[in-house]
């Protein structure tokens, strides 16, 4: 990108597309893009130095502003559908993270997948932390982190957890 007075507005030399699998989180995508950038940067520098680069103006009508994500935006609303909740978990990993509050403690869900259980939004459906969502589907937590503790796989976490089947995790 050529430098322009405004941030991220200059013409670009090359753009690349990548395939994103559904289960990738923000950290995975960042790593994938870093590897692509490392692979392509020398070719792009050569094009510029050899005066072969073709710079194209960006389409500013499709540009969007991305404000900083606040920590509280990571709070999970169990009334949402399972796919949106999984998107929040993946999109906010590793930081600020998607979380819920149970008995006054914050729990960050690090990895989850869509499950088949049904129940009231926020209801714990199994002993392995399957949580009901607002669309009669659920999410199965795979990895979780209790506030101030190390990340844990769900089986290990549930051994000492106060969260049990039938508990309700509210949106409050």
Per-range role (PLM):
Residues 9, 64-68, 96, 108-110:
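Short acidic/glycine-rich loop or secondary-structure boundary segments that cap or lie
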Residues 1-65, 72:
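Donor/substrate-binding cores of folate-linked one-carbon enzymes
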Residues 31, 43, 67, 87, ...:
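Charged/polar, solvent-exposed surface patches and flexible loops
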Residues 79-172:
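An anion-binding loop in the catalytic cleft
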Residues 67-80:
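Acyl-group handling in specialized metabolite and lipid biosynthesis
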């Amino acid at each position: 990108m050529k430098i322009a007075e405004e941030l991220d507005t200059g013409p670009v030399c090359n753009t690349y597309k990548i395939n994103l699998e559904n289960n990738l989180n923000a950290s995975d995508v960042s790593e994938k893009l870093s590897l692509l950038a490392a692979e392509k940067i020398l070719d792009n520098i050569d094009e510029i130095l050899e005066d072969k680069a073709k710079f194209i103006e960006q389409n500013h009508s499709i540009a969007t502003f991305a404000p900083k994500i606040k920590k509280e935006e990571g709070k999970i609303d169990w009334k949402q559908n399972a796919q949106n909740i999984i998107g929040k978990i993946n999109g906010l990993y590793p930081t600020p993270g998607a979380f819920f509050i149970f008995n006054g403690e914050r729990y960050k869900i690090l990895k989850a997948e869509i499950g088949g259980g049904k129940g009231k939004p926020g209801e714990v459906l199994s002993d392995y932390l399957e949580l009901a969502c607002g669309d009669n589907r659920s999410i199965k937590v795979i990895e979780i982190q209790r506030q101030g503790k190390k990340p844990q796989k769900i089986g290990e976490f549930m051994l000492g957890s106060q969260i049990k089947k039938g508990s309700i995790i509210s949106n409050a």
